[in-house]
Amino acid sequence: MNLLLAEVAQATQRLADAGVPSPRTDAEELAAYLHGVKRGELHTVPDADFDARYWEVVARREAREPLQHITGRAYFRYLELQVGPGVFVPRPETESVVGWAIDAVRAMDVVEPCIVDLCTGSGAIALALAQEVPRSRVHAVELSEDALKWTRRNMEGSRVDLRQGDALTAFPDLDGQVDLVVSNPPYIPLTEWEYVAPEARDHDPELALFSGEDGLDLIRGLERTAHRLLRPGGVVVVEHADTQGGQVPWIFTEERGWADAADHPDLNNRPRFATARKALP
């Protein structure tokens, strides 16, 4: 075993003792980041090239600073995104939301589907859809100026129409024209604050995490926004907490102009997102 792999083994134990959920992966990611190699190439780093700063970044992760803040990058589907303080770090669970959205858009057989991403954050969802649905017209909105600093970096050179504003009033010029509305909004109940992982609670912006006493305040508002934006037959996809699968689909009721409301699991088989179709006239 070379020196770097031995140090990674020690770092793994330290991170595990600190309660980090994925200690081995994070120890390897930090080593790869600092030494400019891929995780699978750590064994190729000569002992003489070991960077003593490794223990500095391990200490930061040990203190539960997000891995993505330390490395400045987050991976989402086929994207590498720039992230840091002020913007929500995209989660693997949201990849299931995007996968379902892509399948839904392709099934529509629309030549240039119009897609809106509400609460875009880093831009992960919007950019993934623009990349994987090549002829789509993708629009995204974000309220926070701090988050937008990162969004603009990630979207530089892309064809996504990015705007700053409130998701509830966004894109009046697209009313009734949108094929798909997608959102990963804040949905954590304020009462759950103390149970949120330190990486999120202490580092993600509160605006991107919490939404009222039951966590559903913004989703209730987005239901009306989605209905306003969508064409008849258009689809909405909204992420939620794994404890809200029995509640969110009921926000999209027939009485409010929806059909086919349903809930869907993520790759870990936990309730993760709700979908509904705007009813035909």
From Swiss-Prot:
<feature type="binding site">
    <location>
        <begin position="184"/>
        <end position="187"/>
    </location>
    <ligand>
        <name>substrate</name>
    </ligand>
</feature>
<dbReference type="InterPro" id="IPR004556">
    <property type="entry name" value="HemK-like"/>
</dbReference>
<dbReference type="InterPro" id="IPR002052">
    <property type="entry name" value="DNA_methylase_N6_adenine_CS"/>
</dbReference>
<comment type="similarity">
    <text>Belongs to the protein N5-glutamine methyltransferase family. PrmC subfamily.</text>
</comment>
<comment type="function">
    <text>Methylates the class 1 translation termination release factors RF1/PrfA and RF2/PrfB on the glutamine residue of the universally conserved GGQ motif.</text>
</comment>
<feature type="region of interest" description="Disordered">
    <location>
        <begin position="261"/>
        <end position="281"/>
    </location>
</feature>
<dbReference type="InterPro" id="IPR029063">
    <property type="entry name" value="SAM-dependent_MTases_sf"/>
</dbReference>
<protein>
    <recommendedName>
        <fullName>Release factor glutamine methyltransferase</fullName>
        <ecNumber>2.1.1.297</ecNumber>
    </recommendedName>
</protein>
<dbReference type="InterPro" id="IPR050320">
    <property type="entry name" value="N5-glutamine_MTase"/>
</dbReference>
<dbReference type="InterPro" id="IPR019874">
    <property type="entry name" value="RF_methyltr_PrmC"/>
</dbReference>
<keyword id="KW-0489">Methyltransferase</keyword>
<keyword id="KW-0949">S-adenosyl-L-methionine</keyword>
<dbReference type="GO" id="GO:0032259">
    <property type="term" value="P:methylation"/>
</dbReference>
<feature type="binding site">
    <location>
        <position position="184"/>
    </location>
    <ligand>
        <name>S-adenosyl-L-methionine</name>
    </ligand>
</feature>
<dbReference type="InterPro" id="IPR041698">
    <property type="entry name" value="Methyltransf_25"/>
</dbReference>
<keyword id="KW-0808">Transferase</keyword>
<feature type="binding site">
    <location>
        <position position="142"/>
    </location>
    <ligand>
        <name>S-adenosyl-L-methionine</name>
    </ligand>
</feature>
<dbReference type="GO" id="GO:0006415">
    <property type="term" value="P:translational termination"/>
</dbReference>
<dbReference type="Pfam" id="PF17827">
    <property type="entry name" value="PrmC_N"/>
</dbReference>
<dbReference type="InterPro" id="IPR040758">
    <property type="entry name" value="PrmC_N"/>
</dbReference>
<dbReference type="GO" id="GO:0036009">
    <property type="term" value="F:protein-glutamine N-methyltransferase activity"/>
</dbReference>
<dbReference type="GO" id="GO:0102559">
    <property type="term" value="F:protein-(glutamine-N5) methyltransferase activity"/>
</dbReference>
<dbReference type="Pfam" id="PF13649">
    <property type="entry name" value="Methyltransf_25"/>
</dbReference>
<dbReference type="GO" id="GO:0003676">
    <property type="term" value="F:nucleic acid binding"/>
</dbReference>
